[in-house]
Amino acid sequence: MPDATLPACFLGLLALTSACYFQNCPKGGKRAMSDLELRQCLPCGPGGKGRCFGPSICCGDELGCFVGTAEALRCQEENYLPSPCQSGQKPCGSGGRCAAAGICCNDESCVTEPECREGASFLRRARASDRSNATLLDGPSGALLLRLVQLAGAPEPAEPAQPGVY
């Protein structure tokens, strides 16, 4: 009888603990993730004007990207939320999304990406919901200003982003 108690206890313990081992498992298990709709990632950065792209990456059109800084600390909260999220306008690079003008980020790093530098249409789409900004330029004057800013910009390095503000 005592010889059967140990295996029975082991099987009982195994049955109780064979659930999902990840900290933020969705309801219904890991395979139910594909059924969930993606939500927008948490706001971050100064004034909440950015969006989280990873546990230590916060990017916004007006801000650029913060990688591994205090502005990106809020992004660690995404690890504890049960549903997946997605930030950025369009896909770029290898599994990344356009985070700011000319910057492509995935959940681990950011790189400069020419395909994320669409010009005025990118900025206008990203800010279309921001009606509180009375200085938003549209039309020919906005296009001219954007072109001047692009011409004044220095060539960007093709190396991966290092921790800091970009």
From Swiss-Prot:
Its main location: secreted. One of its GO terms (molecular function) is V1A vasopressin receptor binding. GO terms for cellular component: extracellular space; secretory granule. Keywords: Amidation, Cleavage on pair of basic residues, Disulfide bond, Glycoprotein, Hormone, Secreted, Signal, Vasoactive, Vasoconstrictor. The modification Glycine amide is found at G28. Belongs to the vasopressin/oxytocin family. This is Vasopressin-neurophysin 2-copeptin.
